[in-house]
Amino acid sequence: MALPSAFLNPFVPSPVTANPRTKFARVGKGFNVSCLIKTEQTKSAVTETGVSPATKEVNEPSLSTVLVNYSADWDPYNATSTPIYQTATFKMKSATEFGEYYYSRNANPTRHTLEALLAQIDNAKFAYCFSSGMTALTSVCELVSPGDEIVTVEDIYGGSYNFINNLIGRKEGIVVKHVNTSDLDEVKRNMSNKTKLVWLESPSNPQLRVSDIRSIAKIAHAYGAILFIDNSVMSPVLSNPLDLGADIVMHSATKFIAGNSSCIGGSIATNNEELGNKIHSFQKATGCALSPKDSWICLEGIKTMALRVQEKQRNAQLIAEFLASHPKVTEISYPGLQSDPGYELHNSQSKGPGSVISFKTGSLPLSKQIVEDTKYFSMTVSFGGVGSCICLPWYTSHSSIPDSQKLKVGLTRDLVRLSVGIEDVEDLVMDLQNVLSIQPQF
């Protein structure tokens, strides 16, 4: 949502409620260590050189520190865990005057706290939380009008494909073009003065194909189009698409943000006030905002997001290397492998390869056996939780895409998608090694 002043600089209390114990203050899009002395904020640093604290540059805290120490400065009781405002309404100041909060469909303090934090870590001015990733995507599609065109990555999440082709494209007369966005020339050939939205996933789901976000941003903007990035595979820990030229970034909060597969949610972030206002209006009018309780679950989960992402990625790298060397694996996609075609480009626009891997065996019976017989990989859809997951996208997350379209983009029946968790990596590798060693039953 468009954030009140108290949320734009969430570590800085208002002059009325300043607390001398407050240690962090946001400055622009970075952070400075600060201390509040008698409600007067001054930059300070502990040094051994005698340099004046007023002139000593202070290092910014890491993302892990920010996520753990983030708190709601509006809370009069200074709770270490953000309170859940589980209420439908708030009492008015008078018969003719609302307070800052009056109806939770429009605004809620618990959700505001999460939105403020997500805006901060996405390097955005505005952030909005929705009841699911799909409702977040719906808010973006509301920016497109009949007669407009959408250019989208061809290797796209099945739910997104179904939505923009069957619900938006067919009903509203919007032309949807599925393009190999790893090929900049193909992107250019499909752009026109009717293109309103360019829709990317990088890496894509499930084949983890990498697109040049910086270059595509320039192409989109040359045609006056909006560049939208579904960043769910990466999380704000590993990628900040707004810094690369994107206009809107989306996350499925269900995944890395909440982190425990315990709630459904989505988020949108942008630096464009006009786009932000339109998305916020959609959020309020349709009643699709994230509930106070689910906002709280995300706030609790996000505290460990940086650590979880780091551990999951470490495990995924080792598992990808194991799979790449296994004779029964015919093809593997993971941008952390030097052999991956998107390796260098991905490294230039992200902080790591993430924890999602896809691979092929050339045999549906073998792939089916791997999915069904692993011990520590839950046979389920989604990704980004603490536990490892495994599925066949053809039959699950991408089942709504026509078979011909799946085959066209290389998504075959035997493709296995892994979401690597935080378990002991030796256990995970041994688990995969065991199922790969068993002869499949035809």
Curated annotation (Swiss-Prot):
Record-linked PANTHER family: CYSTATHIONINE BETA-LYASE (PTHR11808:SF50), TRANS-SULFURATION ENZYME FAMILY MEMBER (PTHR11808)
Family the UniProt entry places it in: Belongs to the trans-sulfuration enzymes family.
Descriptive protein name: Mimosinase, chloroplastic
Lineage: Eukaryota, Viridiplantae, Streptophyta, Embryophyta, Tracheophyta
Catalytic activity: L-mimosine + H2O = 3-hydroxy-4H-pyrid-4-one + pyruvate + NH4(+); L,L-cystathionine + H2O = L-homocysteine + pyruvate + NH4(+); an S-substituted L-cysteine + H2O = a thiol + pyruvate + NH4(+)
Temperature dependence as stated in the record: Optimum temperature is 50 degrees Celsius.
Quaternary data: Forms homodimers. May form homotetramers from two homodimers.
Binding site for pyridoxal 5'-phosphate: 103, 105, 133-134, 252, 254
